[in-house]
Amino acid sequence: MEVPRAHGVRAIAAAAEGQDGGAGCDEGAEITLAHGSPLNEDQYIMNMRDAWAPLQQMTTAVTFVGHTHVQGGFSQKEHEWHEIRPRIPVRRDRWALAIPPGTRHLINPGSVGQPRDYDWRAAFAIYDSVACEVTYHRVAYDVRAAQGRILKAGLPERLAARLKEGR
């Protein structure tokens, strides 16, 4: 499978060779991965204003972004715009989001090591291109051990403190 690169953005076929991969999805099997925004790898996408231009210029139905360390995203269908902010209570560990045909989604899976949305648990997402669904996950981990490794490495104390605060 060939992976084209352009300005820090990679378009990747979601299915392995010989698999259907995303037959139910409107835009086919391709997704886009970007560190910040698909338009600028250093851009933070924090709100609908930031998401507007990337959503307008997306060439795939789903684009995964990061940079903010905040789990969630944004969606657009015609003239409807929505912010996606999964609030996963400590008693739950996942939240599913359907990707309906005809929509575009900017998805931030969150951060395993440094969440910045005031939830200390590790955050990630799994994309199912056949079911057309993104499942956001939260997983508890040994924060004290991680804080100890940060301090032992000689890194600033504030980096260790922020882990338990999720910011």
Model-inferred region functions:
Residues L39-E41, F64-Q76, A98, Q114-D119:
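Active-site environment of divalent metal-dependent phosphoester hydrolases
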Residues A61, T68-S75, L159-R167:
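A short, charged
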Residues G21-C25, Q71-S75, A123-Y127:
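Short beta-strand scaffold segments in enzyme catalytic cores
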Residues D42, M46-A51, S75-P86:
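Short, surface-exposed, charged loop/turn segments at secondary-structure junctions
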Residues H79-R167:
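Acidic, His/Gly-rich catalytic cores of divalent-metal-dependent hydrolytic chemistry
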Residues A34, V62-H67, L106-G110:
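Active-site neighborhood of phospho(di)ester-bond hydrolases with catalytic His/Asp-centered motifs
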